[in-house]
Curated annotation (Swiss-Prot):
Its main location: plastid. It comes from Oltmannsiellopsis viridis. It is a single-pass membrane protein. GO terms for biological process: cytochrome complex assembly; photosynthesis. It is found in: Plastid, Chloroplast thylakoid membrane. Disulfide bonds: none annotated. Belongs to the PetG family. One of its GO terms (molecular function) is electron transporter, transferring electrons within cytochrome b6/f complex of photosystem II activity. This is Cytochrome b6-f complex subunit 5.
Amino acid sequence: MVEPLLSGIVLGLVPVTLAGLFVTAYLQYRRGDV
């Protein structure tokens, strides 16, 4: 019963983590560009 929950958590965290890294990199790029 743990695997479905674990896979759900992973599938939920991966996009959020990638989005967070993309946003931080974008903000740093914008801040460094100006």
